[in-house]
Amino acid sequence: MEMASAFTLNVRLDNIAIITIDVPDEKMNTLKAEFASQVRAIIKQLRENKELRGVVFISAKPDNFIAGADINMIGNCKTVQEAEALARQGQQLMAEIHALPIPVIAAIHGACLGGGLELALACHGRVCTDDPKTVLGLPEVQLGLLPGSGGTQRLPRLIGVSTTLEMILTGKQLRAKQALKLGLVDDVVPHSILLEVAVELAKKDRPSSRPLPVRERILAGPLGRALLFKMVGKKTEHKTQGNYPATERILEVVETGLAQGTSSGYDAEARAFGELAMTPQSQALRSIFFASTDVKKDPGSDAPPAPLNSVGILGGGLMGGGIAYVTACKAGLPVRIKDINPQGINHALKYSWDQLEGKVRRRHLKASERDKQLALISGTTDYRGFAHRDLIIEAVFENLELKQQMVAEVEQNCAAHTIFASNTSSLPIGDIAAHATRPEQVIGLHFFSPVEKMPLVEIIPHAGTSAQTIATTVKLAKKQGKTPIVVRDKAGFYVNRILAPYINEAIRMLTKGERVEHIDAALVKFGFPVGPIQLLDEVGIDTGTKIIPVLEAAYGERFSAPANVVSSILNDDRKGRKNGRGFYLYGQKGRKSKKQVDPAIYPLIGAQGQGRLSAPQVSERCVMLMLNEAVRCVDEQVIRSVRDGDIGAVFGIGFPPFLGGPFRYIDSLGAGEVVAIMQRLATQYGSRFTPCERLVEMGARGESFWKTTATDLQ
């Protein structure tokens, strides 16, 4: 059966050809290898029609132009040569579009990313809409790749080399007005006249290339280029710690094109693309992409979710304010905050104001839109306005009696269908629901701080939570822009449970004479965004250590923190960044770079001896405990799958994405090797390193958690 065409050609009466992009049965337009023949057939027709004056590419999708290339194409490649051939095919197709003798214009609405932007760059001009959905970027680096269809060569010639490097090395996405300012697009217009403006542009001569700013012209020359690439290379190495080979290859390929010409540049681009596609880093990053896409499609349960029309929040603190913001401004739902103190409500409202006003200042949002979103948030010191709320999120202090009281008050003041979702990080949901009259409507909804930035939420049903309550809570989390994983109601849930032994071990090494900065640097070198000691300071030492006794009571000695260390720190009024002193001392509020290790921390915790561990030895001790605990969580069905375990660790605590998550990392090392490392560490440092039974069994049988493909579980 012949595949329906994703590209269709219609010639208007004014002899402008309209090529409509609409991938059949897909929400998003993505480029697939099999479309090449369709596009070539259209190009042949365009060349044969001598009456044509111009061409416009436009999408039929309501919210995307082309969201990128289909990543499965890369997964289907088994060798460097196959992946390189894929890139060369893309390059050739873009070259054929660019070589058309009449003006070719891309009319862009919605996401124009990756291969989509490379197609737009191959056109002679670009017009995009002023809609917030319209973004342009080359995010391939986030998959451990580089743009493989000419993007590394066309973009620097259009907008300059320094701006290009910033875009490609970070995967940064530009809004319409930013793209216009940089010269990436020729015009920004309302969606209603996009086609009309693109057609008018196609009737003119090819748009002449805009002269680059003086700074970009200097940086493109030999001296400026040498300085720029040295500086950017150094900065990139510091940021990636050498863990992401794609960044090094991007610099190499862009520089080759500028120094040796586009022919050499395209050749280098295709070769680098092929080699990067086969790296373990790219395979791991693509697995995270597939897993997160899969999680976002997971409804959480088989039951249909209940309608969600409005939400209530109990507690106007930092978490309550953040939850109100994502509920109103991301989910678009009316939200009412209850706090016993009017000041708490004011703080929560100010939180959303600050977030939105920042967007207005950066010109990412209109003032009218800010006001419209703020109008969705209201506050009260009692339960007025709560009767009809579909779901209440509780974000009060971590106190069981208080949370049980909140359940009783919600059941008394809200509708019979109202769901009660607790943002607890440590208390069992079953205990919170113990005295509820409708326990089936009580669930855990654990956000991470800062709420607006952290992508993960844990959804925690207790034994009596209904399937519909789970589905409805998952639905809300997705509307809030979060990636939800459903976890079992056991102490620490998943993320905090695997994080605690990792941080405990860092503190234990500190007491044996290792330096704060050495421990943190070792884990940053391993691939974490910050080290464990700094993480504790950022979260708040009082908040971050609260769960340790809960975990120790539930699981025993392996969760015990070094004796009296935590109490010594807290008794010295050290809470971390929030009060200016923890393991580090902090400068004025807002000056993030001004932090230094406080030498007084060592005598305070009774540190003894001189640190003798290398960076790999430090990271090995912390990470192995995390891996072991993650495997226990699978074994005890705390997480439903290793997919959820990998996503939870990467999105919840910043486990190095290029390793693919704890379970991908175990597979890459081999379960047997992990067992051998842990047995060695157990001999050296004690029984907390004893590998769990599941890991030992898998090592003996040579089993892995994932199949060889990026998307399937063993």
UniProtKB/Swiss-Prot annotation:
One GO biological process term: fatty acid beta-oxidation
Enzyme Commission number(s) from the entry: 4.2.1.17, 5.1.2.3, 1.1.1.35
Lineage: Bacteria, Pseudomonadati, Pseudomonadota, Gammaproteobacteria, Enterobacterales
A GO MF term: 3-hydroxybutyryl-CoA epimerase activity
Protein name: Fatty acid oxidation complex subunit alpha
Region of interest (Enoyl-CoA hydratase), residue spans: 1-190
Subcellular location: Cytoplasm
CDD domains hit by this protein: crotonase-like
Keyword Electron transport applies: no
Pathway(s) served: Lipid metabolism; fatty acid beta-oxidation
Ranges where the record places region 3-hydroxyacyl-CoA dehydrogenase: 306-714
Subunit note: Heterotetramer of two alpha chains (FadJ) and two beta chains (FadI).
Gene (UniProt): fadJ
Highest taxon of source: Bacteria
UniProt cross-references to Pfam families, sorted A to Z: 3HCDH (PF00725), 3HCDH_N (PF02737), ECH_1 (PF00378)
Biological role stated in the UniProt entry: Catalyzes the formation of a hydroxyacyl-CoA by addition of water on enoyl-CoA. Also exhibits 3-hydroxyacyl-CoA epimerase and 3-hydroxyacyl-CoA dehydrogenase activities.
Residues with site note (Important for catalytic activity): E118, E140
Keyword terms: Cytoplasm, Fatty acid metabolism, Isomerase, Lipid degradation, Lipid metabolism, Lyase, Multifunctional enzyme, NAD, Oxidoreductase
Catalysed reactions, semicolon-separated: a (3S)-3-hydroxyacyl-CoA = a (2E)-enoyl-CoA + H2O; a 4-saturated-(3S)-3-hydroxyacyl-CoA = a (3E)-enoyl-CoA + H2O; a (3S)-3-hydroxyacyl-CoA + NAD(+) = a 3-oxoacyl-CoA + NADH + H(+); (3S)-3-hydroxybutanoyl-CoA = (3R)-3-hydroxybutanoyl-CoA
Protein family: In the N-terminal section; belongs to the enoyl-CoA hydratase/isomerase family.
Cellular component, GO, one term: cytoplasm
